Regions:
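Short, solvent-exposed coil/turn segments at beta-strand boundaries
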Residues: 67-71, 89-93, 108-117, 135
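Contiguous, well-ordered beta-strand patches that form the walls/edges
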Residues: 69-105
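Short, exposed beta-strand-loop hairpins at the edges of beta-sheets
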Residues: 107-109, 116-130
Length: 136
């Protein structure tokens, strides 16, 4: 079983709509238009405290993620498309969240620089993803 697919892609399959909040003036990654994010690093940590770094490849994890807050979706290069559960703008950060199958995830994207960090949480392990976003 591919743990990445189970933990990252599956939890993104959500059903609730997104509501944006925050001031009108913001950076290019404020969620007002779609953008792409490249995953550059993945860390998997077990409940035992052992961690392992994973190489990002399209076979084990999506290297590119499309974030479309107005369309309320996150999608990968495959046919996978997921609804966002919540989105908020807080102190210059776009924060996206969701949950499914007993797992939760949260992504924080800097509105000015596009730097991204994602946390995926399960009872037995966590994944931390890092990357950078760009406008298409």
């Amino acid at each position: 079983m591919n743990v990445w697919t189970t933990l990252f892609v599956a939890p993104l399959v959500l059903a609730a709509p997104v509501g944006m909040a925050g001031p009108a003036a913001a950076g290019p990654y404020d969620g007002s238009r779609p953008f792409l994010c490249a995953v550059t690093a993945i860390m998997e940590c077990a409940a035992s405290g052992e961690c392992e770094r994973h190489i990002v490849t399209d076979e084990t994890a999506p290297a590119i993620i499309k974030v479309d807050v107005p369309g309320q979706t996150i999608s990968t290069g495959t046919a996978r498309r997921s609804a966002l559960k919540s989105a908020a703008r807080v102190d210059g950060q776009l924060i996206l969240q969701g949950s499914e199958n007993g797992r939760g995830w949260s992504a924080t994207i800097d509105e000015e620089t596009g730097r991204m960090a994602v946390g995926l949480v399960d009872n037995d392990y966590t994944f931390s993803l890092f990357g950078a976003c760009s406008l298409p």
